[in-house]
């Protein structure tokens, strides 16, 4: 006799919610995501709860960050201000819940890993707030409430440089690269290598190789098991990539920060 399967459970702060419990809540909606990044841009329909409604039960301070942990070790860090938006003219965050009796399709790029479920953070009107692909974490297991990133991971932040390009690059790093990489051995995820120790990418990938690598990693090097996605123009403009490179270049001078 096969062992009984455990029902998927989502942790939100100190609380836990079973999938069946969430699917019965009065706030549940049927939503349509017109261009779903987890499914190759196809249109998908989900049973989902507005993040602002579910997280209203969790005490959040204005400067708190929600770290979204996924089954494969990916961790997206999303600010309270961003994930709790509820007004018109803004992107709206939803937690999509997979019904165990009506499974979603397998992920097209990772069919062996199953679907995007059991829980998936999706957005309606993502273009209104510039939502990036890394802010669509799937196979979510927990939403962890954290304080300010600067307090949690001070070595990620330049100590002296206030150049506007570096500041913009840091913000993009927080929303994208930080989901997989650490900086000076600080960060919530270790899916990818540290981006400063022992070497910073700017020290071994020179122009134009580094911007090209960020845009399309497989155009520089490719191997079985490589996980890093490319960042197309719809995610990163050429200027965005230049800003991220400026931040990385600055951090190459701040390795002593990790001592």
Predicted regions and their residues:
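The canonical Cys-X-X-Cys-His
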Residues: 169-184, 210, 228, 244-248
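Short pre-active-site segment immediately N-terminal to redox-active cysteine/selenocysteine motifs
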Residues: 50, 165, 173-179, 184, ...
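Axial heme c-ligation environment in periplasmic c-type cytochrome domains
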Residues: 190-196, 216-251, 255-259
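Sec/Tat signal peptide C-region and signal peptidase I cleavage site
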Residues: 2-4
């Amino acid at each position: 006799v096969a062992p009984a399967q455990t029902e998927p459970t989502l942790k939100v702060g100190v609380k836990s919610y079973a999938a069946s419990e969430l699917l019965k809540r009065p706030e549940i909606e049927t939503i349509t995501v017109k261009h779903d990044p987890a499914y190759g841009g196809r249109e998908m329909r989900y049973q989902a709860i507005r993040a602002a409604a579910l997280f209203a039960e969790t005490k959040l301070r204005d400067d708190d960050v929600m770290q979204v942990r996924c089954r494969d070790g990916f961790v997206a860090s999303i600010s309270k201000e961003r994930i709790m938006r509820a007004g018109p003219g803004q992107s709206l965050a939803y937690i999509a819940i997979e019904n165990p009796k009506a499974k979603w399709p397998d992920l097209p790029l990772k069919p062996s890993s199953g679907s995007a479920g059991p829980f998936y953070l999706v957005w309606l009107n993502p273009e209104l707030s510039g939502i990036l692909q890394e802010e669509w974490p799937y196979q979510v297991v927990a939403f962890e409430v954290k304080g300010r990133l600067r307090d949690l991971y001070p070595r990620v932040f330049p100590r002296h440089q206030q150049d506007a390009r570096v500041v913009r690059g840091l913000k993009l790093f927080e929303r994208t690269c930080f989901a997989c990489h650490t900086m000076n051995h600080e960060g919530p995820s270790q899916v990818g290598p540290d981006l400063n120790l022992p070497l910073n990418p700017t020290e071994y990938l020179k122009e134009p190789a580094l911007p090209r690598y960020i845009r399309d990693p497989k155009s520089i090097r490719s191997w079985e098991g490589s996980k890093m996605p490319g960042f197309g123009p719809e995610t990163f403009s050429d200027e965005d990539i230049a800003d991220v490179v400026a931040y990385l270049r600055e951090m190459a001078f701040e390795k002593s920060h990790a001592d």
